[in-house]
């Protein structure tokens, strides 16, 4: 399990709680397993997952063992990264999220030490964790904290799973230096 900086402590949970999660096995099969609800620290919030999209570029490749950088030792793993959830508990330093907020990109990035699973972001789990970048000491927030945010009340959580895909498309446009009015050629007819 990841170690926290000395100034950040875990939220103490009186008893172990369990949840269900979708797992990709070493053979590429899917199964539902019962695992511990993720622990969180004082700079994070516990989130009840509401919905999660299926990403052809990530989830399908993880299922078929073709995702770059995920070798056989990465399995079994919890699947899903295009998730939206609702905050149910917050750590003591959290100020950007409150109970009841719908949030983008909650993950299960840490798996309890007694579980054999690895994380494929865990969006198809019953619970996940979101980081509050503002709660961490300067320079110590995980990178994902800057992509996680409160969902505006006017946006349906199911529709919001597409925001994550849109963000990836906008990122590609930025990386390739495309500007408004330019012509581009798109090869293939993938989902994005």
Describe each PLM feature range:
Residues 7-18:
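Short, Lys/Arg-enriched N-terminal segments with co-localized hydrophobic residues
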Residues 20, 31, 36, 48, ...:
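Residues located in well-ordered beta-strands
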Residues 20, 44-46, 183:
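Residues that mark the start of a beta-strand
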Residues 38-53, 66-109, 120-122:
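Glycine-rich beta-strand-centered segment in the early N-terminal region that forms part
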Residues 57-63:
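Cytochrome P450 core scaffold surrounding the K-helix E-X-X-R motif
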Residues 110-184:
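NAD(P)H dinucleotide-binding glycine-rich loop of Rossmann-like/cofactor-binding domains
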Residues 190-191:
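Glycine-rich NAD(P) Rossmann-fold beta1-alpha1 loop
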């Amino acid at each position: 399990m990841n170690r926290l900086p000395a100034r950040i402590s875990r939220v103490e949970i009186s008893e172990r709680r369990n949840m269900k999660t979708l797992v990709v096995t070493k053979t590429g099969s899917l199964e539902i397993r019962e695992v511990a609800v993720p622990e969180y620290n004082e700079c994070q919030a516990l989130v009840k997952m509401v919905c999660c999209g299926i990403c052809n570029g990530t989830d399908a490749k993880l299922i078929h063992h073709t995702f770059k950088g995920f070798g056989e030792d990465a399995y079994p793993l919890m699947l899903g990264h295009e998730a939206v959830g609702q905050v149910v508990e917050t750590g003591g330093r959290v100020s950007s999220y409150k109970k009841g907020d719908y949030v983008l990109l909650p993950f299960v990035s840490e798996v309890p030490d007694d579980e054999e699973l690895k994380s494929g972001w865990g969006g198809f789990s019953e619970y996940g964790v979101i980081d509050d970048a503002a709660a961490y000491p300067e320079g110590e927030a995980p990178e994902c904290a800057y992509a996680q945010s409160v969902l505006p009340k006017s946006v349906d959580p199911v529709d919001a799973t597409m925001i994550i895909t849109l963000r990836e498309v906008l990122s590609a446009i930025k990386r390739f230096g495309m500007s408004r009015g330019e012509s581009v050629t798109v090869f293939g007819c993938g989902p994005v």
